Amino acid sequence: MDTDEQGAPGRKPLDRPQTPDELKFYARNYVMLALLAMILFLPFGILAIYFSIQTNEANKCSNWEDAYRNSSRTMWFNMLAIVAFVGIIYILVLVL
């Protein structure tokens, strides 16, 4: 394996700069929301950060299907972390 390669094993970085049309297709990575999710509920937050990084790598390689799939997964784990945090707080308030 070449040491100059970046990203996941199945992805090859582009050997040219991305065109403005390609840049329009960038999937959102929700990195700030993923950081908040990591603070609120660590297990789902870590997964959200992981898929956010995968989204960035897929965007850089113009692999739009993977980018949008990982972006969706990032958002789901962000929402799960927030719901889990609210649920834990709700249970703690009911018990105490």
UniProtKB/Swiss-Prot annotation:
Main location: membrane
Tissue expression notes: Specifically expressed in testis.
Name of encoding gene: Pmis2
Transmembrane regions: 31-51, 76-96
The protein, known as: Transmembrane protein PMIS2
GO BP term, example: single fertilization
Membrane topology qualifier: Multi-pass membrane protein
Subcellular location(s) of the protein: Membrane
Record key words, sorted: Membrane, Transmembrane, Transmembrane helix
Function statement: May play a role in spermatozoa mobility.
PANTHER family, alphabetized: TRANSMEMBRANE PROTEIN PMIS2 (PTHR14768:SF5), UPF0338 PROTEIN (PTHR14768)
Record-annotated disulphide pairs: none
Gene Ontology CC terms: membrane
Family: Belongs to the CD225/Dispanin family.
